[in-house]
Amino acid sequence: MKKFVALALISLCLSSCNLIFNRYKHSAPKPEVYFPDGLELQMATAIYNDKPRAIRKLIKEGVDLNHVSKGGMTYLYYALLNHNYDVMELLLKHGADPNIHSEFYTNPEYHKRGYSDDQTDATCLEYASHKYFDIKYMKLLIKYGANVNDTTSIGPIWGALRDESHGREKLKYLVEQGLNLNYSQTGTPAICGQALIYEWDMVLFLMDLGADPLA
């Protein structure tokens, strides 16, 4: 009976985790938004529709997996937007570089019409650190060479800090992979930023991980 109850509780916990991630899951834009035509549209469509056979065929035909589309996005980043772990792994196994920046407008059509629009400049690891993603995405990217200390991009630490459910797990893992907690592009290390907003529990947690409040 105890075994049955334990299994039921484990199942409930797993279901709850899935609900949390589904709640925050972004609907990926349709392929043509960032991959308007040609071979890049074919590849993005295969990713969007989760067609690994079509993706393998295009890889075999020589598609450049590190191509940045006319809309400013890599195939790997687009697979991440689709929450497609298996496709990401397929791309990485065949040479996709997780450290290439994607630089794209939030709404390209608005930008084309002359309206003001935010431009994103990010790597896959930075985006995978956010609350929308299970830690397995970060682990996959790091396994295939994602740089936890990339100084050309906003670091993954900032997304992890905003993840109230799994942020600490992500931060601990990043530190285990060599993350420099004391570096910041803005000059304000994460621990100081958390102190400024009175997040003392997080300050103590970062200190336990090795962050230096005097850095």
Predicted regions and their residues:
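Ankyrin repeat domain, specifically the short helix-to-loop turn at the C-terminus of the second helix
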Residues: R56-D64, E89-D97, K139-N147, K172-N180, ...
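N-terminal segments that cap or nucleate solenoid repeat domains
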Residues: Y24-G71
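Positively charged n-region of N-terminal signal peptides that target proteins for export
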Residues: M1-F4
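Conserved ankyrin/ankyrin-like repeat signature
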Residues: A54, D86-V87, K136-Y137, H166-K170, ...
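C-terminal motif of bacterial Sec signal peptides marking the signal peptidase cleavage site
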Residues: S15-S16
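Ankyrin-repeat boundary/"N-cap" motif
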Residues: V33-T45, V68-Y77, H101-S129, D150-R162, ...
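Ankyrin-repeat intra-repeat helix-capping/turn positions
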Residues: D50, H83, Y132-F133, E164-H166, ...
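Sec-dependent N-terminal signal peptides
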Residues: A6-L9
